[in-house]
Structures are given as structure tokens and as C-alpha cells.
Amino acid sequence: MRIGILGGTFNPIHNAHLRIAEEVRDRLDLERVMFVPAASPPHKLLAGELSFEVRYEMVRLAIADNPFFTISDIEGKRGGTSYSIHTLQELHLAYPADEFFFIIGSDSFLDIGSWKEYAAIFNLCNIVVVSRPGAVADPLDKALPVAIADRFCYHAAEKRLTHSSGHSVYSIAGTLLDISSSEIRTLTRQGRSIRYLLPATVEQYIKEQRIYNDGR
């Protein structure tokens, strides 16, 4: 099975996350996209103390009506810092017959050289680099860390890199939905509308549980 992996804090999940997942699934003919909420991401401080369980529930509600989307609590169960390499290793062991497509933003790909055991990630999965709204993405071969650049071959016409392991790095320009989780948190605290920025089920959950109203 061809499975996309989309990780994040999802604090909260919103329509841009969902659209990215849908576009990657459609363009690369993926059979599933697995959302993986982070327990404690190494490159981002969580806003306030919003628990993994609450963020997990918001993702679950957001994807409930899409049969191609699923959710994993693998990072919540593991605890500690949520390193991508550990998550991908666990998934690879649990589903050895499946092919994974790790979905990340272009800004994250530019910073991948700072990730824990980053070189090993390319041995475990394909990577799908999605351009952020308004961003001008560098060609994939220019964004690679120098230390591993010689392990790749760049196919300019396809905007794709192939790794010595046989995996690929794809570049996809996503639909320009300029929505951010921080914006949603701010609007909620101000008592303003967040309608159409995220699924109605998540909006209702945020209101009922008074999430973000206490500064979280």
C-alpha cells in the first residue's frame, strides 16, 4: 500500500492541512494518508500546554468523513521528543510491505540537515516537498545538504530527485490556502469567527471545550 505520512502539532488542524493531504494523495495515487500528531516536536515549541490527547481528538474529528485519511497515535504512545526518524523506523517495522511518502513543507526540507539522523530518513521513505503559500521554492537539488547530495540524481522535468536507495523526493506546489494554526488560536481568543478555516466539527469542539480561551 502507498501511504502518505503527514506529521505536525495540529494545534489546531485546519483546512490547509487537509487540502495538502488530499492534493498529495490525488497526485501521487496514494491509498491512504496517515496523520501523525506530534507529542513533543524538536523544532517547534507548542503553544501553551494543549495536550496530545486534545490535538489527537481534533485531527480525528477533522478526518472522520474521509475514507482515505487515517490517524496514528504512535508519537503519543512513545512519548518524549517526537523525532521523525524514530516514527518512520517504527512504521517501517510495523508495515514492511507498504511504501511511505513523508509529506513536509519546503521550509522544513531546507532545514532537514539539522534533523536527527536525517540521512537515514531517505532510506526509509519517499519525501514529498510541498511549497508554502507565496513561497518561491529552490530546485530540490539545490536544497539538499551537501553531505548527502552525491546520493541523488535530479530529474528537472519531473521536479523529482531519486535517492540511491530507490526512494524519490517529489516537489508539489500546493493550493494557496494561507491559513495558520496561530491565526486560529488568536481569533478564538479574540472571540472572532474561525468558520471556514477548519472543519465545522473541529470548530464546534474548540468552542464546546473552550480550547484557547484560557491562553492555551
From Swiss-Prot:
Alphabetical keyword list: ATP-binding, NAD, Nucleotide-binding, Nucleotidyltransferase, Pyridine nucleotide biosynthesis, Transferase
CDD domains referenced in this protein's UniProt entry, alphabetically: NMNAT
UniProt keyword Cell wall biogenesis/degradation present: no
Pfam families given in the database record: CTP_transf_like
InterPro entries the UniProt entry points to: Cyt_trans-like, NadD/NMNAT, Rossmann-like_a/b/a_fold
GO biological processes: NAD biosynthetic process
SUPFAM superfamilies in UniProt: Nucleotidylyl transferase
Keyword ATP-binding: yes
EC number: 2.7.7.18
Molecular function (Gene Ontology), one example: ATP binding
Reaction equation(s) it catalyzes: nicotinate beta-D-ribonucleotide + ATP + H(+) = deamido-NAD(+) + diphosphate
Pathway listed: Cofactor biosynthesis; NAD(+) biosynthesis; deamido-NAD(+) from nicotinate D-ribonucleotide: step 1/1
Similarity comment: family membership: Belongs to the NadD family.
Physiological role: Catalyzes the reversible adenylation of nicotinate mononucleotide (NaMN) to nicotinic acid adenine dinucleotide (NaAD).
Protein name in UniProt: Probable nicotinate-nucleotide adenylyltransferase
